[in-house]
């Protein structure tokens, strides 16, 4: 695959860009719109930041893990992960303990309050997702999932090339 795939495109495609139909722009706008609607739930109603919510969900999905594993699973950078963990710990939603194999490492686990908070928020954000997707048939939702996975893979390929 060439270093810069766009170099293969005809010149008119390289110089004529219409923002409203430019896929990266449309994806960012859509992601922002959806994210703001969902953030309203966990931020305004439950006083969580976006990184705190993502870390909380990662802990539900992964169980007791290190901060590094939370960061990797939720695509948060180290600083955001650290702040999210600190914030959740201060709010009583998680606790840190020394790792058995190396006391310098910490294992992070949800508290009962953290699990309870997740159980309150998850149905609300899942209802938002259901609302967004109910305009599609089951086949269309399946196709959308395949298309998104394809775009994610291509974006990862582009990142590796750059």
Residue ranges of model-derived segments:
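C-terminal regulatory/oligomerization modules of transcriptional regulators
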Residues: 1-16, 139-162
């Amino acid at each position: 695959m060439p270093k810069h795939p766009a170099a293969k495109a005809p010149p008119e495609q390289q110089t004529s860009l219409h923002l409203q139909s430019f896929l990266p722009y449309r994806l960012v706008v859509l992601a922002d719109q959806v994210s703001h609607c969902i953030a309203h739930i966990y931020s305004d109603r439950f006083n969580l930041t976006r990184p705190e919510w993502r870390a909380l969900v990662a802990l539900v999905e992964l169980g007791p893990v290190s901060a590094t594993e939370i960061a990797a699973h939720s695509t948060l950078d180290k600083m955001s992960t650290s702040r999210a963990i600190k914030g959740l710990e201060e709010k009583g939603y998680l606790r840190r303990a020394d790792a058995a194999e190396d006391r310098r490492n910490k294992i992070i686990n949800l508290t009962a309050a953290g699990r309870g908070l997740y159980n309150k928020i998850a149905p609300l954000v899942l209802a938002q997702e259901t609302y967004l997707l109910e305009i599609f048939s089951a086949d269309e939702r399946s196709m959308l999932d395949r298309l998104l996975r394809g775009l994610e893979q291509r974006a990862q390929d582009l990142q590796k090339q750059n």
